[in-house]
Regions:
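Catalytic cores of soluble, metal-dependent hydrolases
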Residues: 21-23, 28-124
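Mid-sequence, gly/pro-rich, charge-dense loop/helix-turn segments that line enzyme active sites
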Residues: 1-16
Length: 124
């Protein structure tokens, strides 16, 4: 996999190792600050544009539950405030799925044992 074809969306708390990897591999990062400034639609369209420019035809879409604000997705072991709102998350997923390029998906960082408030994480 070409690291330049990795897109991180909704980042807000990176450790030194993660930051070094991002810089070394030149990963595309869309922070929550950027999302608040430009909107999730801008981020989704920018990624779609890059996919088209790079002639990418097969995408693996990995959804990290801890990208969602823990008030709405407590079912994760890595809770960091100021994450994606449920509507932003759903809008982004719809944008990416609309490309018809998704060939595989996974869901990571989901811990249903911690999803103690009416299973709101699972219902997203």
């Amino acid at each position: 996999m070409n690291p330049q074809n990795v897109f991180l969306v909704g980042t807000r708390s990176l450790d030194e190792g993660e930051q070094a990897l991002i810089e070394r591999e030149q990963l595309s990062v869309y922070t929550m600050d950027m999302i608040h400034l430009k909107g999730i639609g801008f981020v989704a369209e920018d990624i779609k544009r890059k996919l088209k420019e790079r002639k990418i035809r097969n995408v693996h879409f990995s959804i990290d539950v801890d990208s969602i604000d823990p008030r709405f997705a407590p079912g994760t072991g890595t809770r960091v405030c100021e994450g994606l709102m449920p509507d932003e998350f759903k809008d982004f997923v719809e944008h990416i799925l609309s490309t018809n390029l998704i060939k595989s998906m996974d869901l990571v960082e989901l811990n249903l044992c911690l999803d103690i408030i009416d299973y709101i994480t699972a219902r997203l």
